[in-house]
Amino acid sequence: MSLSLHRGALSATVLLAAFAISAFKSATTSSNGGLLHAISTPTDKTVISYNGDKSIAKLVTTHAMGDDQYTDVRIPVYQSGKLVKTMSTADEKEQAPTLFSSFGYDAKGHIEKISYYEENQVSGYDSLVYDNKGQLAARYFFVIPAGKKTFENHYCQLYTWDAKGNIIQQENMGRIADNAAFALSSTVGFKYDDKKNSQRSVADFGYITDLNAVNLSANNIVSEVITPANGAHAIAKSYAYAYNSNHYPEKVTTKNNNEEVITELTWE
């Protein structure tokens, strides 16, 4: 998935790196000053640059498609220390960045709405609901259906947290009409190790890329099982980490049935 897509979609490298970036040392506060610099898979490479306060300045992802390749650039914009929007472009040298997303906040300082843009017009938005601990409880997706003129909500995700601060279950819900009841489409179960997820110390990483368990949980995901509600076979994935001498993850091995993907990371 491309960083330039709406709905907060991100490249496969960034998504896989979301697991790897969650090493047990803070990516932004290490005594060695370590910051994640690059993430590579066999088909993609993402380079992350930072502002002086160690917030993300830019994500540049290069995708290889056979003999072709293309680039996605995501640029966060901050005001008074708050993330207010992100810009997107395929080529900073030849194409000016355009508005990709904007963020609205509630009275408690939580991001409650993420709007997505196409040609400077809102093409969809997410409405976010938090529990009394400030944890994301639900995410409602709004789009304008074909042939209609107003936004409707046909899909949502519900999150269950454990006492350690990890999302242990995500329920994917759908409905045919905006006024119909939601029905369960699939359930995703997560298991974790006991290592600290340093990704949460990278300011706004989840909102810049995507809101999911790996971006929000306190520990590192080691297994993920997707169970369809229609009784179809479940899909299981596992994640294993290798660390360098400074205790940073330098490799993540993702296994899905007989497939294996290796993600390599470099630090600065």
Model-based region annotation:
Residues 1-32:
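Bacterial Sec-dependent N-terminal signal peptides
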